[in-house]
């Protein structure tokens, strides 16, 4: 019989890899979950996501509770204590069990000599919890965001930054996209009801359904047969502006993992779609999504800055550019973003977006539509990016989304329960 793994130590090591090594939790967590029993998968995910969501608070508390930070080979213990604090603050796990399992985690990370230290710090927190939390709630750390990002949000949204931060710190709802080639949304909602679950239609996006309670995908009616796809409502909004038509040649650039590629084909099943992404590994998910939905598209690996390398001189009727960005609009869904991103990344990403826009524009037919989209809330990547593009591109015209002075449509996190997202619809004169 396989020895029971210590979930607390696994969570601590995963968070350490995110914060100290810059690895994405999306890459780290799935292989870890394969190592634990089905009943423990959800708890492992909760511990990892929860610690990353509240990292500022947990770090602040440790600095108050310990005279010196844990460094070097003992650094993992710092994150193990974070996991312990998170359980005491945010879970229903009985405190004695949370303490015992966290202390035992020291053995799993080969630091058994520090069991007493871990136990002492966590018990000290229990004794001082009320006064520590009162002090924390009066500090800037209470916003649970790195200071550089907080400053950018305050500058860009002087009236709204607090609501953005609050939305980022919430657990996200689960949004689905009903495949209209199989069922109407109303029909699928009836099937969902028959399966004992409840969903709510989005007022503006015709395929979007929000589950009352998140559920595993295998429990959703027809998921394996392509009847429904997990996709946030704001991401589904891209199709409102792209408006793909049958018979058109359409490019989905920066396409992985393929959610928007398949949405194009649901709306326009007879469109000729080319899906391109620079990341060959992530392209495998585009193939997986196409296969599950029984769809066909031309899938290519390529760099958006050099389109002639993968499409020659070909032009398209419509282009969806879901540009690489800071992902500051989806922090509630991916809390590791707060700790993976740095302030210096923003101008670098804006430059990359600018290069891709300039490179792909000649591949749009005259009269064609390009939708520029990001899951960012930062103006440098969004309205300012499009404003600069319009100023230097004589044959580009903004359509339906904003004004030349304030181009694009910005959805903020939590608005209509969707992610933060930006769209700009451009027409080639």
From Swiss-Prot:
GO cellular component, one term: cytosol
Localisation: Cytoplasm
Active site: 375
PROSITE patterns reported for this sequence: NOL1_NOP2_SUN, SAM_MT_RSMB_NOP
SUPFAM superfamilies assigned to the protein according to its UniProt record, in alphabetical order: NusB-like, S-adenosyl-L-methionine-dependent methyltransferases
Entry's Gene Ontology BP terms: regulation of DNA-templated transcription; rRNA base methylation
Reactions it catalyzes: cytidine(967) in 16S rRNA + S-adenosyl-L-methionine = 5-methylcytidine(967) in 16S rRNA + S-adenosyl-L-homocysteine + H(+)
CDD domains with a match to the protein in the record: AdoMet_MTases (cd02440), Methyltransferase_Sun (cd00620)
Binding positions (S-adenosyl-L-methionine): 254-260, 277, 303, 322
Xref: Gene3D superfamilies: Helix hairpin bin, NusB-like, Sun protein, domain 3, Vaccinia Virus protein VP39
EC id: 2.1.1.176
InterPro entries, per the entry: MeTrfase_RsmB-F_NOP2_cat (IPR049560), MeTrfase_RsmB-F_NOP2_dom (IPR001678), NusB-like_sf (IPR035926), NusB_RsmB_TIM44 (IPR006027), RCMT (IPR023267), rRNA_ssu_MeTfrase_B (IPR004573), rRNA_ssu_MeTfrase_B_ent (IPR023541), RsmB-like_ferredoxin (IPR054728)
Keywords: Cytoplasm, Methyltransferase, RNA-binding, rRNA processing, S-adenosyl-L-methionine, Transferase
A GO molecular-function descriptor: RNA binding
HAMAP family: 16SrRNA_methyltr_B (MF_01856)
Protein function: Specifically methylates the cytosine at position 967 (m5C967) of 16S rRNA.
Family statement drawn from the similarity comment of this UniProt entry: Belongs to the class I-like SAM-binding methyltransferase superfamily. RsmB/NOP family.
Protein name according to UniProt: Ribosomal RNA small subunit methyltransferase B
Origin organism lineage: Bacteria, Pseudomonadati, Pseudomonadota, Gammaproteobacteria, Enterobacterales
């Amino acid at each position: 019989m396989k020895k029971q793994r210590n979930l607390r130590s696994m969570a601590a090591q995963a968070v350490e890899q995110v914060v100290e090594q810059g690895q994405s939790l999306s890459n780290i967590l799935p292989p870890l979950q394969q190592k634990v029993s089905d009943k423990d998968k959800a708890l492992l995910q909760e511990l990892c996501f929860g610690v990353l969501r509240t990292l500022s608070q947990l770090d602040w508390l440790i600095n108050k509770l310990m005279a010196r930070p844990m460094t070097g080979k003992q650094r993992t213990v710092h994150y193990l204590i974070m996991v312990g604090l998170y359980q005491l603050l945010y879970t229903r796990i009985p405190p004695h069990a949370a303490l015992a399992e966290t202390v035992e985690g020291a053995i799993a990370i080969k630091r058994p000599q520090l069991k007493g230290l871990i136990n002492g710090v966590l018990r000290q927190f229990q004794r001082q919890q009320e006064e520590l939390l009162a002090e924390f709630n009066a500090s800037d750390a209470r916003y649970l965001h790195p200071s550089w990002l907080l400053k950018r949000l305050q500058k860009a949204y002087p009236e709204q930054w607090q609501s953005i931060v609050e939305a980022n710190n919430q657990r996200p709802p689960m949004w689905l996209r009903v495949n209209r080639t199989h069922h109407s949304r109303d029909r699928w909602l009836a099937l969902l009801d028959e399966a004992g679950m409840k969903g709510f239609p989005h007022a503006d996006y015709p395929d979007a359904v929000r589950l009352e309670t998140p559920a595993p995908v295998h429990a959703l009616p027809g998921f394996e047969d392509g009847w429904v796809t997990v996709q946030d409502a704001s991401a589904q909004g891209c199709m409102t502006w792209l408006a793909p038509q049958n018979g058109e040649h359409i490019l989905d650039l920066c396409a992985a993992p393929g959610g928007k590629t398949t949405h194009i084909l649901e709306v326009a099943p007879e469109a000729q779609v080319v899906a391109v992404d620079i990341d060959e590994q992530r392209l495998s998910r585009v193939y997986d999504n196409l296969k599950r939905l029984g769809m066909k598209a031309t899938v290519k690996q390529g760099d958006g800055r050099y389109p002639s390398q993968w499409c020659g001189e070909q032009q398209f009727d419509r282009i969806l550019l879901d540009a690489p960005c800071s992902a500051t609009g989806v922090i509630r869904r991916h809390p590791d973003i707060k700790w993976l991103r740095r302030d210096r990344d923003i101008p670098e990403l804006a430059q990359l977006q600018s290069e891709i826009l300039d490179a792909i524009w000649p591949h749009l037919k005259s009269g064609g539509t390009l939708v520029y989209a990001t899951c960012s809330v930062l103006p440098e990547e969004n309205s300012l990016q499009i404003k600069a593009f319009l100023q230097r591109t004589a044959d580009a015209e903004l359509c339906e989304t904003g004004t030349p002075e304030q181009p694009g449509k910005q959805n903020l996190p939590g608005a209509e329960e969707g992610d933060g997202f930006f769209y700009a619809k451009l027409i080639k004169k």
